Design a protein with these regions (language model features):
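Peptidyl-prolyl cis-trans isomerase
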Residues: 1-179
Length: 179
């Protein structure tokens, strides 16, 4: 009954303004524990004829070059993703490299991280478009978590309201028994 009650009444629309308001009033809750990054990642074979071209192009800020990179990379790379407009946790990126994030960050030179796994024929590389190492996490990084927090608070309020209403109804109808 409780689940049905909640699903029928829970307002799941969370506006950007509500997220921003919560973020601004709870910034201490969003202090970074690890760096967050915007990156372009590629896993390419060391002997690929396009390797150097792909590595050069993932670091390009030119829109035309970037689109060419997408098509060349898709055909040349074992794995590729573009998170240049989305913040990601450094630990998640480090997992792509198969190392911990401090090892990964120590391999960064001129915003490029390159790691050649031992015993494999590939090269893992990421171009770091932006990085925040400390301070308050960017709102965009926290938005999904804040949305969950706000929905959870609404759900909790609904459950409390249901419990209060049931208790009041039971007391009014003298159906409340204490054992």
């Amino acid at each position: 009954y409780e689940q049905r009650y909640i699903s029928d009444r829970l307002d799941t629309l969370v506006t950007d303004a509500q997220i921003s308001e919560y973020y601004m009033s709870h910034q201490d809750d969003f202090v970074l524990q690890r760096p967050v990054m915007k990156v372009r990642f590629v896993d390419v074979m060391k002997d690929s004829p396009n390797k150097d071209h792909v590595l050069k192009m993932i670091s390009s800020d030119e829109f035309d070059e970037f689109h060419r990179t997408d098509s060349i990379t898709v055909s040349s790379a074992l794995r590729y993703f573009d998170n240049s407009d989305v913040w990601m946790d450094a630990r998640d990126l480090a997992a792509e490299f198969g190392v911990d994030y401090s090892q990964m960050l120590s391999a960064m030179k001129d915003n490029m991280i390159k790691i050649e796994p031992e015993g494999r024929g590939d090269l893992l590389a990421a171009y770091v478009c932006d990085i925040r190492r400390s301070g308050v996490a960017p709102l965009e990084f926290c938005a999904a978590e804040i949305r969950d927090i706000l929905l959870s608070a609404r759900k909790h309020a609904l459950v409390k309201g249901l419990e209060r209403d049931l208790l009041e109804t039971a007391l009014e109808n003298r159906q409340f028994v204490i054992y």
